[in-house]
Amino acid sequence: MNYNKKTVADVAVTGKKVLLRCDFNVPQDKRTGEITSDKRIVAALPTIRYLLDNGAAVIACSHLGKPEPVFDKWVKKQTEKGKDPAELTEAAWKKSLAKLTMAPVAERLAELLGREVLFAHDVVGEDASAKAAALQPGQILLLENTRFERGETKNDPDFARKLASLAELYVSDAFGAVHRAHASTAGVADYLPAVSGFLIEKELQVMGGALANPKRPLVAILGGSKVSSKIGVINNLLEIADTIIIGGGMAYTFCAAQGGKIGDSLLESEWMDYANQMLQKAADKGVKLLLPVDTVIADRFAPDADTAVVEAGKIPDGWQGLDIGPRTVEQYCAAVADAGTVIWNGPMGVFEFDKFAAGTKAVAEALSKTDAITIVGGGDSAAAVEQLGYADKMTHISTGGGASLEFLEGKELPGVACLLDK
């Protein structure tokens, strides 16, 4: 896939209405609706400011949350109260989704920009159409949650066309959503010239560069609970990496595949053959595939569980592995110290419990001290690095969880493929 895409800096924007897809899917307090982290809004500011400073009229849009489960829960409650589900119409759909409105995002964006952010109470309805039509250069309008329109997640051409009709140019800056072929991330590019914003440009340059032309040795650290979620990543990185480090719950499937005893540890037995195939492929290609040599075990899955450290493959019945052990930490950190490029995706243990966070903390610290190019995938790894205060020591922390994972798999990303090539 070609990652050399045109950016907002490559096209004329002055006097144009620009549809800007951002990733404003921010975490909120469940009770008050208050935004608990504005990191994703801040990440979009460079592109927004560039467009406004260069005389564009910006029509920003994003999704927020998952409306369908919220609606289903609401319908269930109404049904329990004696309402007929058939009577819960489109108006009811919108009423049930009030908590997923983009209004708080508009308020926070206005504070960060230091200027007014107009807000449309729909996506392609009368309010959005009127406000978009009246929008002047240097002004910004935020549309309501794109997922309030059922055609969004279906990539419905009719909805995509209506959304595109509000503007003259499409700019995609929502890396966290480019792995989804939705109307606002891919479909609109069928009706408008489409380029990337600065956030996506950086993601493509840094992550694409690490895969296409890495400073070697290239070390990939893969954690998380399941082998099944990392199949494509391991397979793709075996073609590129010099060393692959396995941690987290998925290490126990590899261990069991080699005949080790893993007690009550997480096991995906259906993936044991695959694990052995990957070990053989690594050997055939001369890639070092490092597995834990010791593990921190617990008598139950709880933050206050009794713990012990045992050799890998020798976990007694009734116990489960929840973190990599100290000798493994030493080996993994040594590999990081010698690396030219490090890509990290997934924690080494149950990071949420202090007793089983040492492995993840040690890897994060090792990345903070190395001279290598360090790239942290989104999700739990990024959260760990930020929580530990090492974020500013990393070369790049990806803004996309699922998107960065699919990038590492070598998959085509619909929200990138639809952009104009340079």
Segments from the language model and where they lie:
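Active-site loop-to-helix "anion-binding N-cap" substructures in soluble metabolic enzymes
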Residues: 1-422
